[in-house]
Design a protein with these regions (language model features):
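Active-site hotspot residues in diverse enzymes, especially metal/ion-binding acidic/histidine motifs
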Residues: 1-288
Length: 288
């Protein structure tokens, strides 16, 4: 048991307990067993074989220090959350998922209590489980896209940065990975609009990230519509609200796009963004 004491210490146990992923345990043996049960493995060596060897494409900036233990704990929590969905996840249907992009985009106008179940139901019908999982320390994660099986996918999101423009950009970024890129890969990202030049990734990963970024940006605000709005040269809050309503998206989504296009400063228009937070329930479970 003593040989695994250092392994146990590498996991953010307090946060995992606070979110209800682990029962608070006292002894080293209890903590070890709780971790093994959580991961569904028989030993730390088995964890190493299953989780450290997972083919993870992790877009990670140098600003964030991460550990495989924390990242794997978050990824496992997303798996378990997907198993508890209220909706049965059907076999993956690319055409159906593409046909739903407009409806999913329209959910950007809704509050969390309405868009969460709607997004989950729509995506489950196309073969994608969508879950929201609190970020753990030493992960720096905004979202993840991976395949649970050949015919079922998972998209998991945190509330990193806690604004609707970032959350929805991450959502459609991860959807792009599901629709455009290889199966049997796990795409974990830190920030959907981070400059790729700051990332340590190979050329193929960079192309995939750029494709996912462009897909997300253009799905939320089509280029022709963005051009039309920019040509008007009126970027007041009222103009943004009116044009967002015309597009059928939340005004914070347009603000975020204008900021990334350097038309607005990052200190402008933020009052139009919807902000999200986690609530910790009576049983220490996290909910959006």
């Amino acid at each position: 048991l003593e040989q695994w004491a250092d392994w146990i210490k590498k996991f953010p146990m307090k946060d995992m307990e606070r979110y209800g992923w682990l029962e608070p345990e006292g002894t080293k043996e209890q903590k070890l067993n709780a971790l093994l049960n959580f991961f569904g493995v028989s030993s730390p060596d088995s964890w190493d074989a299953v989780w450290r060897a997972t083919n993870v494409a992790y877009r990670q900036t140098r600003r964030f220090r991460t550990t495989p233990e924390a990242v794997s704990a978050w990824a496992r929590a997303a798996e378990l959350e997907a198993e508890q969905l209220d909706f049965e996840v059907q076999d993956f249907d690319e055409n159906r998922l593409r046909s739903l992009l407009g409806k999913l985009r329209n959910q950007t106008t809704e509050p969390a209590e309405r868009f969460v179940p709607t997004v989950q139901e729509l995506c489950a019908g196309a073969g994608v489980a969508v879950v929201w999982v609190p970020e753990l320390p030493q992960t720096g994660i905004s979202g993840c896209a991976r395949w649970l099986a050949d015919n079922k996918a998972l998209v998991a999101l945190t509330l990193r940065y806690k604004t609707d423009d970032q959350m929805w950009l991450t959502f459609f970024h991860e959807m792009a990975h599901i629709l455009l890129h290889k199966k049997h890969r796990c795409f974990i990202m830190d920030n959907a609009d981070q400059d790729l030049a700051d990332n340590v990734i190979d050329p193929q990963m960079q192309r995939e990230e750029e494709e996912a970024n462009r897909f997300a940006e253009d799905t939320l605000v089509p280029p022709s519509d963005l051009h039309t709005f920019i040509q008007k040269s009126s970027f007041s809050l009222e103009s943004i609200k009116q044009f967002s309503e015309k597009l059928g998206i939340g005004p914070g989504i347009l603000v975020g796009r204008l900021q990334r296009e350097e038309i607005l400063g990052y200190n402008q228009g933020n009052g139009l963004k919807r902000k999200f937070n986690w609530t910790i329930g009576e049983k220490d479970s996290a909910a959006l």
